[in-house]
Amino acid sequence: MRFAWLASVLLVVGGILDAATPPRSKKQFINPNGVPKPTGYTQVVTSGPGQMIFLSGQGGAAPDGTMPEDFATQARNTFENIGRCLAVANARFEDIVKINYYVTDMAYTAELRRIRAQYLNQAAPPASTLVQTALGQGLRLEVEVIAIVPE
């Protein structure tokens, strides 16, 4: 009888403690089609409530993985890759709340702004531009993005 009473108390207390624990945010890790497959990381992670989307650094590789030599083509490919990554999380460019640019030469920033304006045509989100002398082989630009999609 004592055992049954103790077991009942433990079940009730366990249920109360379990009910008081807030649910963990739901995370989903995604590697979208049309974006080069990564090794050792994921291209996109989403998290809720109010879906937060974190993109790994996107570069200028074409969907087949080839790397163009010129900066303008790399920049366009980079923003196309960002668009594909956002789309798998039901997000768009206007959902971006933070963006970080890594370039191998500050001389590229004028061209970057011109191409960026074709994709980010709303109020510009907070951004950082950093010179990074050692990106991946042949890479002249890498862009990290955080976006939020309301529930």
PLM features per residue range, with description:
Residues 3-80, 84-97, 103-151:
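N-terminal presequence-like segments and the immediate start of the first folded domain
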